[in-house]
Amino acid sequence: MFKTIRCNQINDKLVNQRIEINAWVKKIRHHGKVTFINLRDRYDEAQVLVSDENLLKITSQIKMEYCIKVQGTLELRPLELANKEMKTGAFEILAENIDIISRCNELPFMIEDNNNANDNAKLEYRYLDLRREEQKQKIILRSKVTHIIRNYLTKKDFLELETPTFVKSTPEGARDFLVPSRIHKGHFYALPQSPQIYKQLTMVAGLDKYFQIARCYRDEDSRGDRQPEFTQLDLEMSFIKKENIFKLMENLMFTIFKNTLNIALPKKFKKMTYKHAMNTYGSDKPDTRYELLIQDMSKHFKKSSFNVFQDMLQNKGTIKALIIKNQAHNFSRSKINNLEEHAKIYKARGLYFAKIENNEFSGGIAKFLNEIKQTLIEAYSLANNDIIFFIADSWETACKAMGQVRIKIATELNLINKNIFEFLWIYDFPLFEYDEDTKSYQAAHHMFSLPKQKYIHTLESNPSKVLGEVYDLVLNGMELGSGSIRVHTRELQQRIFNIVGFKNEIAEERFGFFLKALEYGAPIHGGIAIGIDRLLMLMTHSSSIKDVILFPKNSFAASPLDKSPSRISNEQLRELNLTIENYKN
């Protein structure tokens, strides 16, 4: 009898015992009258020694990535022949039987070479890509993380509940994926962009602690690293303040990182307001792994002779500056020009600079700084070989553009420590933002967030000034999650709908079922959604979320693996009472 084991179960206790392993051929080497086979399964590797004449005939047919069954006796290898690069390198299996379970076609790329395949090939043959150790470990980590999340929240009395996948189309910003109904001709379901409304209804139902590992869908234009379907940890709690969410998520992240990467995060994360983040880092999701803080130099230029700055200040603009210490020699004119072009992408009018050389300003706008030279040197402890960059613009543009310059400089100067994880909370976000194109207000996050108490009575008079009970969790300069305390009365929810352009009749048609629920004793409640794909990407230092999704789409929301999306038959269209115009196009 042979004992069936996995590769990682090989140990001293099994020496001289007969074992069976089912696995894939990672490597095969023929050496005259012996053949060595390296097997790989999900758990580890093992080496097989084949010397039997009949078995050698079988091994002559075996190629890499064949799936085979090996039966044999486990032996210790001579000490000098032990493979120290393998956990099981001190052992080998002396083969007695070998069966080919299934053969493998010529490989589209080498499994052991991570760099020899383009992205499209890796997506088309994702099942082969996942045999690579690095890719496999990322998916295994994903499973561990979701398991930890479930255990942690269940112990905190949360209920794991499933909200509907077919829902009413209630636009939340991006386009909905629509599903035609065969039974209800001419009617459509939408796939949820998030479980937002349904988790709030769960609170109205009195189920005060909810969570879900939720699949979400957004029909967005192709850009960057977006996926049309993604996964988030969605949770909601009743009778809470934002501090309750902060504590819950800090402890959860601590548990995840400690039990997977053996990294002890701080028990409490940094916190800063949206305004402070924008002023200091030029971003509402700042990367705090490096300093490089933005300075507001407006007060120093109030009496400056530099008309560009003077005009901007008189028009209620601001002067933002970035001081790079002891690095002026690294900024050639061409590099500075590239930085200026980068700033202009983010709508800045220009990027100005001055260097400190021989205790004097030089280059750029140096001649306009003489009258405030000593003030700047003392205020910012300037020294030789420092360089200052300036942006004069509206507050929002100056902050955002300088924030992008900050990121580019930090990347080029290699200032970012990629081996640390810096979490922080951003809170007190604006509730609304004004769209210059449509001349109307939009929800900055979403329409269900509660305004801070002091703004509730003046919502309509100045929406731009209204701050909300909204918070984001940021990790290494990336928004990991977003949440808020929610509106829990119909009257206030209707007012917010009106501000963003949903008059009563439109709001009733789209959200009537939700507004009705708010009339039946809704509790104070709030929650957060954490992007699991994004979390895993950061934990594994991956360059793309595709690496941590089992079967991802490409950048065009298509699957090279199953060739979706695909056309459907005329019969299917007739059943749905649909016709397609210009099908050939």
UniProtKB/Swiss-Prot annotation:
What's the catalysed reaction? tRNA(Asx) + L-aspartate + ATP = L-aspartyl-tRNA(Asx) + AMP + diphosphate
Alphabetized InterPro entries for the sequence: Aa-tRNA-synt_II, aa-tRNA-synth_II, aa-tRNA-synth_II/BPL/LPL, Asp-tRNA-ligase_1, Asp-tRNA-ligase_1_N, Asp/Asn-tRNA-synth_IIb, AspRS_core, GAD-like_sf
Q: What is its main location?
A: cytoplasm
Q: Which domain of life is it from?
A: Bacteria
Question: Which residues are involved in binding ATP?
Answer: 218-220, 227, 479, 531-534
Keyword list, A-Z:
Aminoacyl-tRNA synthetase, ATP-binding, Cytoplasm, Ligase, Nucleotide-binding, Protein biosynthesis
The places in or outside the cell where this protein is found are: Cytoplasm
The entry assigns this protein to a family as follows:
Belongs to the class-II aminoacyl-tRNA synthetase family. Type 1 subfamily.
Function, as annotated, reads: Aspartyl-tRNA synthetase with relaxed tRNA specificity since it is able to aspartylate not only its cognate tRNA(Asp) but also tRNA(Asn). Reaction proceeds in two steps: L-aspartate is first activated by ATP to form Asp-AMP and then transferred to the acceptor end of tRNA(Asp/Asn).
Query: What is the name attached to this protein's record?
Result: Aspartate--tRNA(Asp/Asn) ligase
Q: What is the lineage of its organism?
A: Bacteria, Pseudomonadati, Spirochaetota, Spirochaetia, Spirochaetales
